[in-house]
Swiss-Prot record:
Tissue: Skeletal muscle.
Active site location: C129, H335, N359
Main location: cytoplasm
Subunit structure: Homodimer; via EF-hand domain 4. Interacts with TTN/titin. Interacts with CMYA5; this interaction, which results in CMYA5 proteolysis, may protect CAPN3 from autolysis. Interacts with SIMC1. Interacts with UTP25; the interaction is required for CAPN3 translocation to the nucleolus.
Gene Ontology MF: a single term: calcium ion binding
CDD domains per the UniProt record, alphabetical: Calpain_III (cd00214), CysPc (cd00044), EFh_PEF_CAPN3 (cd16190)
Source organism, top-level taxon: Eukaryota
Gene: CAPN3
Region feature Disordered, mapped onto this chain: 1-36, 604-652
Basic and acidic residues biased stretches: 623-635
Positions bound to Ca(2+) 1: A663, D666, E668, E673
Taxonomic lineage from the root: Eukaryota, Metazoa, Chordata, Craniata, Vertebrata
Name of this protein: Calpain-3
């Protein structure tokens, strides 16, 4: 019986380290040995042939910057233009924003004023507090900050209106280039701004992140860990504070010491991501509130800067339009906070554990014990105050006791820069393997274990845990590892209607007799074997990760969406303390009853398609158990050769007579005649419920069975085709269990295997895309056409693979003849 897997809304964990150590280095390999780990390995032939349609390679920041300086022009980004298309996609904005460059907004604009720090960040009206909370955490780690935000940029030296930032994207670091045009209203920045009016690094960083996801609106609502991962490539872990371990404070302390990024939040009871408006609030209402907010914050005339004075005063701020729920204690539900420090302070002779948090609004703070204006600060020693940097200022940052923290907050997210367990006192070197894959509707999007008929079709990844942990205090022979599953590009595709899928994974132990066997595990295996481990829940967040401890062995990881038929891409990473091997399960591509090759005899290129099809006779003789001694003799079947009737059986004689009636005296049939004879036969099989073969299908059959390049089929060729169709018809009926005249595309895997073809996951995906209808069903005509093409292409490859090394070399004429006549 399938186990019930809960589906819930919860933040996710996991990602890959960015530091140039062993983890980052290993990640560069991306599991290329598996065949499915390299992103170019997914339908690479199809993607490559269509690449010229997409366009040329983008120019780098350095090239664009140099070009602008040479031409003495300011850069305008054509990919993310300063207009409404870069702002919102769900509806048109009712008022006109003015896009301005920083020198047009204020005098003496600066990229960074006095160093980038957490107090620079003030949230605008976008609802991206999750992103800004992550920026505040990022400023605490200067090494990471300098990677994301190259500091050699300014509005004076070599200024050309162009800036760039770097983000981690699914295993790679990408450089995002933007112009410095920013949306303004009443000469004020609409979205993120700095505490200093003439500082713009954070507004430009937000714009680069918006470009990465397609628009500013795409940033509305999210989880802090998502941005943390994109800033670091780190591994994120998620804690429900009510279920947190007793030493949670120790875990948080070590996270701070190791440069990890931390965020927290308070559930608002709606299961919404941070900064997301209530479901009833439409984009139009958000826009109206934004306009009211901006009108209310318009500068007074007396606030104008006298001519010639520097415009580096603090920004005038108001609380932005928010939909989170503010509590009496000053905290806000459904809102993201940054954890910026942990300390212990002496208070009335006792040590008190403290947590420092920051609200990305830049104001609205905790008003309880240890808040800025707490009356009992007078009982705290002066030196302690200095150490805690206590000051009464409305900057959004505040202290609170750890006890109050765990009482009020419900979620804690920690983005680690390595996969070291924070409970451990020592740092280890972890190894990582990275695989990229996709769920394809109708083929490899099988859903979770609750759907046993399709679960087995999901991508599968073999995990070999080869060595146990080095832990002298642990008597168990155990391997520690972390699995992180991340779905790709869902935020960017929001404007196309995409939402985050509910995802998770299960881990099964592979039986010893199947170790080293890379075959895709079948349905029966999962029906009769329970998982050894799995993600705690399926969640509709970008990533889910989990730590496990299992004995050394061989396992299979099955990542999936909760519901079947949901199509998308993902990245699966496995971190372990010791050496491991994680690779996608890929069947060896082959066909049963391999055709014997003609040794030392080159193909004469009258029609290489026809020459490759001369192996038909060999295949036929092999099936009939005949002696295959002479390739030339095998090329024709003597029993069905015109004029040779002495050895024919009664059945063969009847077959010849029927064929003569159709073909006439020349004993050859064209595509129209083939269509008539095949449809005359299949129409008698009412259970197939087919409308018959199309003319195009019959043309393909002739091309793939033609041995002499005549464009017609003789008796022998037709006999071979007919035998194949009868065999494939039996397979089709076997899988057409409901007698609908179609088979489910998920069952095509087994049907292809029963026909003697062994393919990998990519080819199964391609078959589904090519032959299934919109309901993911394959009718009899498409079924036969698929098998005819498979047989013909295997046979053609075999004929051209003269030395049997699995590689063929064709010139352009050979390639076009082979593919056009198919």
């Amino acid at each position: 019986m399938p186990t019930v897997i809960s589906a819930s809304v919860a933040p996710r964990t996991g990602a890959e380290p960015m530091s140039p150590g062993p983890i980052a280095q290993a990640a560069q390999d991306k599991g290329t040995e598996a065949g499915g780990g390299n992103p170019s390995g997914i339908y690479s032939a199809i993607i490559s042939r269509n690449f010229p349609i997409i366009g040329v390679k983008e120019k780098t920041f350095e090239q664009l910057h140099k070009k602008c300086l040479e031409k003495k022009v300011l850069f305008v980004d054509p990919e993310f233009p300063p207009d409404e298309t870069s702002l919102f996609y769900s509806q048109k904005f009712p008022i006109q924003f003015v896009w301005k460059r920083p020198p047009e907004i204020c005098e003496n604009p600066r990229f960074i004023v006095g160093g980038a720090n957490r107090t620079d960040i003030c949230q605008g009206d976008l609802g991206d507090c999750w992103f800004l909370a992550a920026i505040a955490c990022l400023t605490l780690n200067k090494r990471l900050l300098f990677r994301v935000i190259p500091h050699d940029q300014s509005f004076t030296e070599n200024y050309a209106g162009i800036f760039h930032f770097q983000f981690w994207r699914y295993g790679d670091w990408v450089d995002v280039v933007i112009d410095d045009c920013l949306p303004t209203y009443n000469n004020q920045l609409v979205f993120t701004k700095s505490n200093h009016r003439n500082e713009f690094w954070n507004a430009l960083l937000e714009k680069a992140y918006a470009k990465l996801h397609g628009s500013y609106e795409a940033l509305k609502g999210g989880n802090t860990t998502e941005a943390m991962e994109d800033f670091t490539g780190g591994v994120t872990e998620f804690f429900e504070i009510k279920d947190a371990p007793r030493d949670m404070y120790k875990i948080m302390k070590k996270a701070i010491e190791r440069g990890s990024l931390m965020g927290c939040s308070i559930d608002d009871g709606t299961n919404m991501t941070y900064g997301t408006s209530p479901s009833g609030l439409k984009m139009g209402e958000l826009i109206e509130r934004m306009v009211r907010n901006m009108d209310n914050s318009r500068l007074r005339d007396s606030d104008l800067i006298p001519e010639g004075c520097s415009d580096d005063r603090p920004t005038r701020m108001i609380v932005p339009v928010q939909f989170e729920t503010r509590m009496a204690c000053g905290l806000v539900k459904g809102h993201a906070y940054s954890v910026t420090g942990l300390e212990e302070a002496l208070y009335k002779g006792e040590k008190v554990k403290l947590v420092r948090l920051r609200n990305p609004w830049g104001q609205v703070e905790w008003n309880g014990s240890w808040s800025d204006s707490w009356k009992d600060w007078s009982y705290v020693d002066k030196d302690e105050k200095a150490r805690l940097q206590h000051q009464v200022t409305e900057d959004g940052e505040f202290w609170m006791s750890y006890d109050d923290f765990i009482y009020h907050f419900t979620k804690l997210e920690i983005c680690n820069l390595t996969a070291d367990a924070l409970e451990s006192d020592k740092l280890q070197t972890w190894t990582v393997s990275v695989n990229e894959g996709r769920w394809v509707r109708g083929c490899s999007a099988g859903g979770c274990r609750n759907f046993p008929d399709t679960f087995w079709t999901n991508p599968q990844y073999r995990l070999k845990l080869l060595e146990e942990d080095d832990d002298p205090d642990d008597s168990e022979v155990i391997c520690s590892f972390l699995v992180a599953l991340m779905q790709k590009n869902r935020r960017k595709d929001r404007k196309l209607g995409a939402n985050l899928f509910t995802i998770g994974f299960a881990i099964y132990e592979v039986p010893k007799e199947m170790h080293g066997n890379k075959q895709h595990l079948q349905k029966d295996f999962f029906l009769y074997n329970a998982s050894k481990a799995r993600s705690r829940t399926y969640i509709n967040m970008r990533e889910v990760s989990e730590r496990f401890r299992l004995p050394p062995s061989e396992y299979v990881i099955v990542p999936s969406t909760y519901e079947p038929h949901q199509e998308g891409e993902f990245i699966l990473r496995v971190f372990s303390e010791k050496r491991n091997l994680s690779e996608e399960v890929e069947n060896t591509i082959s066909v049963d009853r391999p055709v014997k090759k003609k040794k030392n005899k080159p193909i004469i290129f009258v029609s290489d398609r026809a020459n490759s099809n001369k192996e038909l006779g060999v295949d036929q003789e092999t099936e009939e158990g005949k002696d295959n001694t002479s390739p030339d003799k095998q090329a024709k079947s003597p029993q069905l050769e015109p004029g040779n009737t002495d050895q024919e059986s009664e059945e063969q004689r009847q077959f010849r007579n029927i064929f003569r009636q159709i073909a006439g005296d020349d004993m050859e049939i064209c595509a129209d005649e083939l269509k008539n004879v095949l449809n005359r036969v299949v129409n008698k099989h009412k259970d197939l419920k087919t409308q018959g073969f199309t003319l195009e299908s019959c043309r393909s059959m002739i091309a793939l069975m033609d041995t002499d390049g005549s464009g017609r089929l003789n008796l022998q060729e037709f006999h071979h085709l007919w035998k194949k169709i009868k065999t494939w018809q039996k397979i089709f009926k076997h899988y057409d269990t409901d007698q609908s005249g179609t088979i489910n595309s998920y069952e095509m895997r087994n049907a292809v295997k029963d026909a003697g073809f062994h393919l990998n996951n990519q080819l199964y995906d391609i078959i589904t895309m090519r032959y299934a209808d919109k309901y993911m069903n394959i009718d009899f005509d498409s079924f036969i056409c698929c098998f005819v093409r498979l047989e013909g292409m295997f046979r053609a490859f075999n004929a051209f693979d003269k030395d049997g090394d699995g590689i063929i070399k064709l010139n352009v004429l050979e390639w076009l003849q082979l593919t056009m006549y198919a």
